[in-house]
Amino acid sequence: MSQISAKDVKDLRDKTGVGMMDCKKALEETGGDMQKAIEYLRKKGAALAAKRAGREASEGIIAIRISDDNTSGVIIELNCETDFVARGDDFTGFAAAIADLALENGIASAEAMMSLKLGEAYGNESVEDSIKTMTGRLGEKIDLKRLSLLQTSTGIIASYIHPGSQLGAIVELATDKPAESAELARDIAMQVAASSPIVVDRSVVPAENIEKEKEIFRQQALSQGKPEQFVEKIVTGRLEKYYQEVVLLEQPFIKDSNSRVQGVLEEFARKNGAAVSVTRFVRYQLGA
């Protein structure tokens, strides 16, 4: 067996991020051949990934990337098994690399990411193979759970990520004054993250949701002994409160609870002589 130098072990560690003892073993197993040692570690990572495939990966982080011109944005959820790994530089750096690659290539789903190749820092492997390698490096199941992309040619994309990186949102505003709308867009992203709306406008609340809520409100009123002739009025009132919870434009504004989001948009438009509206949003909460 050839002599394995400390420098070779360090070089392999720098190339792969794997622990020193594992790097030494890989070099010993491959007769000191650096490329074969890298392949050995990749195979070991793939084997561990297969072994841990059935494990639950419920920890992790949300990562967001926005283009320099604020016309594209990506949000991802990358999972692992423990909070300890989720907070580590290797894991957070990996999430950032995936989000950067998705933004650069305009990828809109986790599935479409798998064949794309990450950079030299990840051995120019595909995302799919890099996930296996990272599983071997960190000793936990790693999973790219979901990914969403927003793009606009008529407005601005903005984001908010809550401290701890377990909650985040990206939003698209249609506006003829994107630069002036940047702060407003960030506020709306914070609103989405904090208040968890399900739609922008009440007109697109799914009909089945409305009927389900109305039936719940109706049964609640009857079980409380409300006179039947007043039940429909009660249902209507409670439905309005429901809209204020789930419809973004009807929610109390997070920075001023006396104003609604719709009113904030209208006031901004009036003051700035701008056309502005919320087109869509994506909100991710870890595990939700």
From Swiss-Prot:
InterPro entries: EF-Ts_dimer_sf, Transl_elong_EFTs/EF1B, Transl_elong_EFTs/EF1B_dimer, Transl_elong_Ts_CS, UBA-like_sf. Residues 82-85 are annotated as: Involved in Mg(2+) ion dislocation from EF-Tu. SUPFAM superfamilies: Elongation factor Ts (EF-Ts), dimerisation domain, UBA-like. Pfam families: EF_TS. Keywords: Cytoplasm, Elongation factor, Protein biosynthesis. It is found in: Cytoplasm. Belongs to the EF-Ts family. PANTHER family: ELONGATION FACTOR TS (PTHR11741), ELONGATION FACTOR TS, MITOCHONDRIAL (PTHR11741:SF0). This is Elongation factor Ts.
